[in-house]
Amino acid sequence: LHVRSRRQRQMCIRDSSHGAQVIFPDDPQFEGMPKNADDRRFMAMPAYLGGKYQMAGMKWYGSNCENKASGLPRSILMMMLNDKDTGAPLALMSANLVSCYRTGAIPGVGAKYLARKDSETVTIIGPGVMGRTCLLAFLSVCPKITTVKVKGRGQRSLHAFEEFVKKECPQIQQVIVCDSMEEAVKDSDIICVTSTAPVKEIDFPYIAEDWVKKGALICLPSAARFDDDFLINRCKKVVDNYKLYEAWAEEFPYPSYEMVQIIGSKFTDYLHEGRIQREDIVDIADIINKKHPGRESDDEIIVYSVGGMPVEDIAWGGTCLLYTSD
């Protein structure tokens, strides 16, 4: 996890960008040009990470929801790792699992510092690979979890998720497949949305405040929609790295959320509107370093934004390379 260190660099003036994105128009004017669609993009995510890693590199991926019809994953990712001094290539590796495990790990860090210690039920909205790695991370830091609720779009992915839980998660005693968001969210201690986001904010998965259990942690590596009054006035807003959202706000000027599709950009939209103050958005690093309190009561609802940083990919990719070399 990035914990406020100068020993890292990412693309952009603030050294905290998610990366450089290629997207396509809604109405292409040239033959053969792709058309805008849900999660259709290319992304380059370069970074340098110091400390014990001393590694430069880049994750590159293409994403298209239509891949599923061809039996391919939505995103297909590669990672290049380079010597930080010479630039010589050290490894070119598939990065699908690297990316999924690093994405799952960050909600796990959030649960470690923000979830109630007596959490027993977790909800996964989107039973794909990212939902699985998030669940594994939650189980590693919340040993009292015994029930997982899951909502998905198709029976095939739901069945695969159930089989995964039976095989890999022995502490889970019950898997509940839910037909609605309300059923999935109610009575859960941890709610995690990992589903593919639609293009328009109005179509993002909706979570009503009165469905959310007091004291719940809502982890959002993907998009969700809430009532403004709840987000502004009745939840703690935590982000994985505030500067990441500042960089997004520069790249995608207000309103940013519909384009970025990570809830931290909704927070910066509120900041732009003057509806919240900067101090209302808390960096997880400040909680880890004890500069800011984490959970302040058993009834506090916390919304945790997970944007994803290239330095995390370099850290985990570099670790995998180290184990391979050994």
Predicted regions and their residues:
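Single conserved hydrophobic/aromatic residue that forms the stacking wall/gate
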Residues: 1-9, 13, 323-326
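N-terminal entrance/gating region of PLP-dependent enzymes' catalytic architecture
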Residues: 14-78, 84-90
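A glycine-rich, Thr/Ser-enriched phosphate-binding loop motif common to dinucleotide/cofactor-binding enzymes
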Residues: 93-112
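Glycine-rich adenosine-cofactor-binding loop
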Residues: 107, 119-139, 152-153
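NAD(P)-binding Rossmann-fold cofactor-contacting core
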Residues: 143-165
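Short acidic low-complexity segments
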Residues: 173-188, 205-207
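Rossmann-fold NAD(P) dinucleotide-binding segment
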Residues: 199-214
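Adenosine-phosphate binding glycine-rich loop
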Residues: 224, 229-325
